Amino acid sequence: MSDRLDDDTISDRLPDDWIHDGDAITRTYTFEEYLDGVAFASEVGDLADEAFHHPEITIRYDEVEVRFTDHEAGGVTSQDIELARRTDDRR
């Protein structure tokens, strides 16, 4: 289990366009086509499964929201930040 990061560390390390929201970090990606968003969500799912650290993924018509947190640590960890970066790389 990773250690929970404090708010200052999260702010310093949070990738652009991600939001620190309570005990999680979130980002909403916009897509012109619904199926492009579905494909992206599937890629994020594969990435997360490889890391055995599973985000909440919400698919809407033209948006996909990704939310990372570590329930065992009770907040955001270094693994969440790293997976946020790797998720951005998929886009």
From Swiss-Prot:
Q: Which reaction does it catalyse?
A: (4aS,6R)-4a-hydroxy-L-erythro-5,6,7,8-tetrahydrobiopterin = (6R)-L-erythro-6,7-dihydrobiopterin + H2O
Q: From the record, give the transmembrane residue ranges.
A: none
User: Per the UniProt record, which EC number(s) apply here?
Assistant: 4.2.1.96
Record GO biological process: tetrahydrobiopterin biosynthetic process
Any GO molecular function: 4-alpha-hydroxytetrahydrobiopterin dehydratase activity
Q: Broadest EC class?
A: lyase
Q: Which UniProt keywords apply?
A: Lyase
Task: Mention any Pfam family matching this sequence.
Answer: Pterin_4a
Record-linked Gene3D superfamilies: Transcriptional coactivator/pterin dehydratase
Q: Which family does it belong to?
A: Belongs to the pterin-4-alpha-carbinolamine dehydratase family.
Q: Which PANTHER family match?
A: PTERIN-4-ALPHA-CARBINOLAMINE DEHYDRATASE
The record's listing under NCBIfam families reads: PRK00823.1-2
- Full protein name: Putative pterin-4-alpha-carbinolamine dehydratase
